[in-house]
Amino acid sequence: MVSRKRNSVIYRFASLLLVLMLSACSALQGTPQPAPPVTDHPQEIRRDQTQGLQRIGSVSTMVRGSPDDALAEIKAKAVAAKADYYVVVMVDETIVTGQWYSQAILYRK
């Protein structure tokens, strides 16, 4: 009797957990948004703002300093490539303390 009751509780808890996890997944999917108007310098955008833009390549950097230094280097490379927008894919510290690796995808209108 106790085992059957415990199985029922576990089954209900597992069902509730599954429903909560599935609803959380839908919260992560963003609906496409338009990119901001083009300016004279590249702008960082989110992944859901890339619809309708032309991908022109990707860039990566490895710098000593801080994450802000890595992002500044990404922006400088986007300027050199004459990109209108860029999406930062990752900024991560390497095994070496103070050395940062970053990647971004470049887009044009």
UniProtKB/Swiss-Prot annotation:
Disulfide bonds: none
Lipidation (N-palmitoyl cysteine): 25
UniProt cross-references to Gene3D superfamilies, sorted A to Z: Flavin-binding protein dodecin
Induction: Up-regulated in biofilms.
Signal peptide as annotated in the record: 1-24
A Pfam family hit: YdgH_BhsA-like
Lipidation (S-diacylglycerol cysteine): 25
GO cellular component, one term: plasma membrane
GO terms, biological process: DNA damage response; response to stress; single-species biofilm formation
Membrane topology: Lipid-anchor
Compartments, record wording: Cell membrane
Family label: Belongs to the BhsA/McbA family.
UniProt-listed NCBIfam families: PRK14864.1 (NF011433)
Chain's role: Involved in protection of biofilms against oxidative stress.
Annotated protein name in UniProt: Lipoprotein BsmA
Species name: Escherichia coli (strain K12)
Gene: bsmA
